[in-house]
């Protein structure tokens, strides 16, 4: 596959002007990757984003802790698990207030992974109760998971509930919902997802289809996190694998030359700036695909390495990850000062897979 990357001189200048710590030494060494992960983790915990603590944005912090848990597993550093436990305890191991809203389910990913580490009933009870009620009264995916971000928020919770209970009803529900949402929002001609119905059959001011980078990052990250718990013999596993492969090819073609993706995947001119939350999720998904022999190493390793370099260049000396598009629903402007917890979570997910690359 021939990869076509968008070139932008301002982005190259940004990369060249990145902190010296991001450009010295081997940024791909395990020591360096661990150091960047720890620095970003520590800075983000010390500088919580105020709005992320609100219930209606519980997902933003939940996405951070998905990365924290992954970092704990990949590094063996229990400080990640300890911090995740403190957060879960502050939530009383409870999901958000909206029982059918995927955003309010995202925290369950961390709760369930902590339950595996210590099987205390309180760690499982609320997540299982909320999801059981939803499974008992199913609706189409396009109704409950009507925006593509939802495919990161809720499906990995269902996959993890299956893993801890062995009850296939969670996989059956996940599968039906996922593919109905996909039939609704996926554009097979582009191998990408629209954010929601408002972008179907709609062109931007430049006459291009609008595929939001972070939205597709959510989908690729969610696909990986479902595959992690989906049995090898599951009847539709090959379909998830094919989806990951197709999306990987689509996003690789539009990677910026500095390694970071633009907010609008098919039209970098719509928002001609780098965006790091999408870069983190794409790098994570591509690296996981290579590590699990789903994606071709020769094709994707250069893409992954550029993605990681772009992320590292976006971390300042203190550990703040910049260039994270704010909470929104479409491509938008981003600055070097913009930070959100889900961006740091995406970097931790990517770093966790970078540590496994050979």
Residue ranges and their predicted role:
Residues 1-4:
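N-terminal secretory signal peptides that target proteins for export/translocation
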Residues 8-18:
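Bacterial N-terminal signal peptides
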Residues 19-23, 242:
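Polybasic, low-complexity, intrinsically disordered segments
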Residues 23-62, 69-90, 94-127, 261-262, ...:
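CBM-like carbohydrate-recognition segments
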Residues 45, 49, 76, 92-96, ...:
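Helix-capping and short linker residues that terminate individual alpha-solenoid repeat units
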Residues 68, 158:
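Conserved H-X4-D acyltransferase segment
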Residues 123-156:
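Asp-box/WD-like beta-propeller blade repeats and closely related beta-sheet repeat scaffolds
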Residues 148-152, 159-265, 272-283, 295-326, ...:
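Extended ligand-binding clefts on enzyme/binding-domain cores
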């Amino acid at each position: 596959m021939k990869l076509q990357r968008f070139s932008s001189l301002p982005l190259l200048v940004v990369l060249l002007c990145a902190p010296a710590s991001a450009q010295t030494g081997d940024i791909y060494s395990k020591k360096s990757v661990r150091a960047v992960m720890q620095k970003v983790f520590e800075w983000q915990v010390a500088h919580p984003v105020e709005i992320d603590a609100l219930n209606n944005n519980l997902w933003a912090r939940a996405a951070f802790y998905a990365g924290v848990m992954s970092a704990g597993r990949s590094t063996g550093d229990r400080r990640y698990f300890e911090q995740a436990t403190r957060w879960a305890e502050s939530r009383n191991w409870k999901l958000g207030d909206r029982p059918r809203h995927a955003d309010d389910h995202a925290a369950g990913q961390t709760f369930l992974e902590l339950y595996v580490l210590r099987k205390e009933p309180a760690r499982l009870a609320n997540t299982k109760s909320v999801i059981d009620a939803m499974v008992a009264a199913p609706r189409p995916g396009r109704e409950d998971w009507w925006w593509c971000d939802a495919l990161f928020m809720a499906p990995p919770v269902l996959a993890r509930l299956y893993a801890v209970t062995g009850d296939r009803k969670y996989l059956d529900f996940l599968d039906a919902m996922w593919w109905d949402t996909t039939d609704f929002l996926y554009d097979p001609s582009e191998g990408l997802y629209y954010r929601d119905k408002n972008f179907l059959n709609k062109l931007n001011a430049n006459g291009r289809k609008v595929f939001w980078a972070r939205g597709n990052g959510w989908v690729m990250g969610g696909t990986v996190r479902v595959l992690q718990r989906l049995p090898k013999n599951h009847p539709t596993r090959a379909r998830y694998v094919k989806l990951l492969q197709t999306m990987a090819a689509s996003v690789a073609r539009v990677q910026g030359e500095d390694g970071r993706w633009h907010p609008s995947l098919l039209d970098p001119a719509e928002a001609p700036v780098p965006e790091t939350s999408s870069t983190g999720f794409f790098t994570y998904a591509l690296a996981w695909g290579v590590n699990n022999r789903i994606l071709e190493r020769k094709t994707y390793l250069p893409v992954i390495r550029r993605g990681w370099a772009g992320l590292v260049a976006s971390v300042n000396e203190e550990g703040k990850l910049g260039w994270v598009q704010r909470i929104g629903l479409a491509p938008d402007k981003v600055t070097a000062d913009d930070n959100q917890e889900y961006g740091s979570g995406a970097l931790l997910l990517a770093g966790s897979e970078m540590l496994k690359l050979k």
